[in-house]
């Protein structure tokens, strides 16, 4: 085994793709200690900065004192608790769906919804740039997998005309995690209706960020949420841990009876459920936080434009594609030397030849942090 492991790791390293863990000690939503030095983070998914919001931390502490550190069992055994039930009701209201079902992670939620709904006689039409969890759900299902061009409704239509099966599914992200762009959801919904397909939208990065009161990309697109399937996470804008699926009323019942990644795993800890529930309440009670996020996004994108740097899209995720892993690593290391932490994103997380800096803006960033980072970024890209 040792020889195989060493040989594989050497190949990964030779391609500039070897990864390692870097311990960070959080100091707040956007700052951390790295090797004893304070750095500013422009890479987290903590879009609203709610991990340190007083209401969120207080509710988590209260749940910790009341319920302890873990759930102790699967939900169908003794792991279901009042906080999980309240969280599911709040998520259903947020998404405008009849019901929601919470999972330990967003990954397990996607495995469940696709891997359980689809089967060997079905066809799944999946965007080429969808997250690994969506692709793994497709492969797990055993259904025929057809990849359509990224965010391309014409490509999807052509393929829908070419491939038939018992049932058909259209799978996309609401806000793409690596490119920061949004698909034409109204067109996809129309195609789903026309071809009697089931539309599944992973709104992990749109939840809490887009749409009225942060209800997500489906609400932003004006699509009736009760007629499609939405998955998402609690670990990004909602400042906790976990995943969820919303959809027609019977979907939750179906998944809790059939989805292996729900049945055979320990329930989300009460402390995580409490934090996510509090974050949803903050979204409703403090709209200024979401407004602040978009003010920061605009400030950063305007700063990029002023420096002649690409700023496509309109979201808190800004990819600067540098091509080779080596160049992306050099740029990331230069930024770190200047006190900014933005790891290089390399294949297989992104397609070959598109290694990048994946920059994310948070509501918790200050104007001074944004302006300082813009100056540092210009220097890093020149020297990369």
Curated annotation (Swiss-Prot):
Q: Does the keyword Transferase apply?
A: yes
Question: Which UniProt keywords are given for this protein, alphabetically ordered?
Answer: Biotin biosynthesis, Pyridoxal phosphate, Transferase
- Stored InterPro entries: Aminotrans_II_pyridoxalP_BS, Aminotransferase_I/II_large, AON_synthase_class-II, AONS_Archaea/Proteobacteria, PyrdxlP-dep_Trfase, PyrdxlP-dep_Trfase_major, PyrdxlP-dep_Trfase_small
Catalysis: reaction(s): 6-carboxyhexanoyl-[ACP] + L-alanine + H(+) = (8S)-8-amino-7-oxononanoate + holo-[ACP] + CO2
Biological or metabolic pathway of the protein: Cofactor biosynthesis; biotin biosynthesis
UniProt modified residues of type N6-(pyridoxal phosphate)lysine: 236
E.C. numbers: 2.3.1.47
Q: Which GO terms describe its biological process?
A: biotin biosynthetic process
Q: Which SUPFAM superfamilies match?
A: PLP-dependent transferases (SSF53383)
> Out of the domains of life, which is the source?
Bacteria
Recorded GO molecular functions are:
8-amino-7-oxononanoate synthase activity; pyridoxal phosphate binding
Identify the Pfam families for this entry: Aminotran_1_2 (PF00155)
Q: Where does substrate bind?
A: 19, 131
Which cofactors are reported in the record for this sequence? pyridoxal 5'-phosphate
The protein's job, in short, is: Catalyzes the decarboxylative condensation of pimeloyl-[acyl-carrier protein] and L-alanine to produce 8-amino-7-oxononanoate (AON), [acyl-carrier protein], and carbon dioxide.
Q: Which family does it belong to?
A: Belongs to the class-II pyridoxal-phosphate-dependent aminotransferase family. BioF subfamily.
Description of how the protein assembles with itself and partners: Homodimer.
Entry protein name: Putative 8-amino-7-oxononanoate synthase
Lineage, uppermost ranks: Bacteria, Bacillati, Bacillota, Clostridia, Thermoanaerobacterales
């Amino acid at each position: 085994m040792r020889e195989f492991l060493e040989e594989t790791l050497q190949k990964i390293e030779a391609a500039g793709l070897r990864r390692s863990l870097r311990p960070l000690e959080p100091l707040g939503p956007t700052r951390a200690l790295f090797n004893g030095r304070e750095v500013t983070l422009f890479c987290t998914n903590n879009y609203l900065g709610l991990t340190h919001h007083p209401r969120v931390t207080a509710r988590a502490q209260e749940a910790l004192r009341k319920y302890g550190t873990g759930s102790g069992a699967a939900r169908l055994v003794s792991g279901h608790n009042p906080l999980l039930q309240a969280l599911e009701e709040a998520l259903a209201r947020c998404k405008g769906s009849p019901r929601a079902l919470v999972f330990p992670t967003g990954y397990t939620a996607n495995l469940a919804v696709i891997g359980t709904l689809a089967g060997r006689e079905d066809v799944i039409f999946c965007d080429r740039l969808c997250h690994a969890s969506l692709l793994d759900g497709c492969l797990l299902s055993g259904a025929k997998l057809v990849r359509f061009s990224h965010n391309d409704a014409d490509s999807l239509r052509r393929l829908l005309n070419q491939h038939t099966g018992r049932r058909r599914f259209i799978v996309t992200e609401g806000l793409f995690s690596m490119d920061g762009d949004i698909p034409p959801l109204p067109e996809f919904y129309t195609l789903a209706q026309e071809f009697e397909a089931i539309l599944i939208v992973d709104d992990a990065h749109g939840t809490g960020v887009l749409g009225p009161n942060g209800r997500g990309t489906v609400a932003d697109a004006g699509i009736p949420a009760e007629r499609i399937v939405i998955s998402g996470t609690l670990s990004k804008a909602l400042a906790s841990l976990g995943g969820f699926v919303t959809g027609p009323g019977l979907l939750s019942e179906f998944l809790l009876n059939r989805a292996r990644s729900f049945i055979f795993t320990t329930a989300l800890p009460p402390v995580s459920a409490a934090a996510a529930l509090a974050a949803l309440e903050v979204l409703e009670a403090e709209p200024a936080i979401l407004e602040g996020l978009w003010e920061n996004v605009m400030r950063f994108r305007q700063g990029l434009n002023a420096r002649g740097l690409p700023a496509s899209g309109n979201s808190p995720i800004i990819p600067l594609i540098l091509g080779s892993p080596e160049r992306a690593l050099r740029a990331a290391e230069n930024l770190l030397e200047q006190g900014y932490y933005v790891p290089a994103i390399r294949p297989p997380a992104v397609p070959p030849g598109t290694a990048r800096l994946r920059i994310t803006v948070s509501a918790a960033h200050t104007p001074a942090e944004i302006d300082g980072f813009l100056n540092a970024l210009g220097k890093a890209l020149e020297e990369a």
